[in-house]
Amino acid sequence: MKKLLHTLLLFAVGLFAACQAPTSGGDVYLNDFLDDLTAQTDAGPAIRAALSHCARIRAARLILPGGELRIRPDLAVEKYQFISNNDEGLKRIAFDLVGLQDFTIEGADTKLLFTGFVSPFNLERCRNITIRNLSIDFTRTFHSEGTVRAAGNGWLDLEFPDKYRCDLTDGCLRFLDDEGRVYPYSSLLEFDTQRCEPAFHVDDYWLPAHTIPAERRPNGWIRIFRSDLKAAIGNTMVFGAARRLNPGITVSDSQGIAILDVKLHHCGGMGVIAQRSRDIGIERMEVVPAPGKKRMISITADATHFSNCGGQIRLIDCTFENQKDDASNIHGLYMPVDTIFDRERIWVRWGHSGHCLLYTSPSPRDPKTSR
């Protein structure tokens, strides 16, 4: 009798737990993993926990809470990435989706506000994923902007708003955020402040040393020096980000991706970069400067970029404005050249781990694999 009662009790406990657990294919609410403090300081750990839970129960949707979520890189997912036409390196990622299928991130008009060097979204080996109804911005942009206040032979005086904090180190200009992170730059480009577009017939000033000689004037303006510098008074000088470190949405080895009603106000690389993927639809996406923040630039590279992709690529009713490069690029095979043997033969290689080439030794019974 005791054994029977024990068995029935275990069954009842198991049944109760099963009833309480989310069912496969259901909705998961990020609010269940958040509290008021983490939402306003760093929602990153809650996002990691929620996505892990979604993968475990095969949830259909992760529903964000609306309002504003602040996200930092400190406790974000960390992985080394090779991303086409962006800089490789160790990345911190907020929403890291790996191997998910038939899954939607429902933004519910949530404003994702990032601080520091963090990539908002990464999709790897996914199928039938939708990201919708959210906006992305950063507390400090990866580029910097200053207003031209005076000009002379080989110099410009620039006034920087407080949001583009700067100082001088070894006689050269350096940009930082409020926490001391350095934001390197590698180019200057003049913009017409009134028309919000590159000034007429301006030159690109490339800075191989990723800096420029400068001094602080008594009135607080910064004077920069270069022999060929020129710009119109009142225009905006944009200091372009030196590297493409943190794209907005990265898609790799995936299929059936939909990006709907997403507003991308800033990121430190391309907006949407897809590689080795197929069937990608982007609808009503806006890559535009953040309203009310008086920025000239939206994002620091292409709005969208597709490399080694197949199937259908659809861009429908999108707005791409003031990004620092193309609205879209769609490439075919894209691999670095390793060796040029002669005018008719080259050796190319994949820049990504996991790709193999099978070749056969002189003995057909002894195949070998080379990575």
Region roles according to the model:
Residues K2-L10:
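Sec-dependent signal peptide recognition
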Residues L15-G26:
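Bacterial Sec-dependent signal peptides at the C-terminal "C-region" and cleavage site
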Residues L30-I63:
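Acidic Gly/Asp/Thr-rich repetitive segments characteristic of extracellular carbohydrate-active
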Residues R48-A55, R70-T104, L113-R132, R140-P161, ...:
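Extracellular beta-strand-rich solenoid/capping regions of secreted or surface-exposed proteins
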Residues P73-L90, F95, T141-L245, E286-H305, ...:
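Acidic/polar low-complexity surface segments
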Residues G234-N235, A241-I257, H265-R278, P289, ...:
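Beta-propeller domains
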Residues Y359-R365:
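Conserved small/polar residues in nucleotide/adenosyl-binding loops
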